[in-house]
Amino acid sequence: MINEILQKSEKKMAASLDVLSQELSGIRTGRSSPALVEHIKVEYAGVPTPINHLASIAAPDPRYITIQPWDRSCLSAIEKAIMKSDLGLMPNNDGNIIRLNIPPLSEERRQEMIKMVSKRLEEDKIAMRNVRRDAMDEMKKLEKSKEISQDDLKRGSDQLQKITDSFIAKADKLGADKETELKQV
């Protein structure tokens, strides 16, 4: 029973870490990367659709991203979605391809991005701690109903803490790597 609770908690924490990783990859660093725009939602046929489902995205050099839609009719919708996003990029539409010039980040914008990374990282850690709390509550209920012993509860809580610490360390590393990337000029 405890193993099931631990496995369920581990899956939830891994999912939370994946979401954090995706969100951090979408934060602009002054260097072009398709991940910067691929998850921006575009209103296409009445359905919000990620850009990477509508077009090929390439980063031919460190300062440019090109977006080539498979259906040219969605060019203006992609352009509008990019302008609405909080990336601060101005799309250049030539009728076939959208080009995005990635200007170097100002020091002020760099600091804003670092704060955004820290905030997102803290939210993720809170989510992981909530998963831990829920799992502990489940184990305490089992102990209270005499389905597991106090020793099992102690062992389970120790294992749960190790799992939580491991995932929080991974999240911290993702955040630190992104901050380092943002600080590079």
Swiss-Prot record:
Primary location class: cytoplasm
GO biological process: translational termination
Pfam families: RRF
Keywords from the named record: Cytoplasm, Protein biosynthesis
Disulfide bonds listed in the record: none
HAMAP family: RRF (MF_00040)
Family stated for the protein in its record: Belongs to the RRF family.
Stated name of the protein: Ribosome-recycling factor
Lineage per the UniProt record: Bacteria, Bacillati, Chloroflexota, Dehalococcoidia, Dehalococcoidales
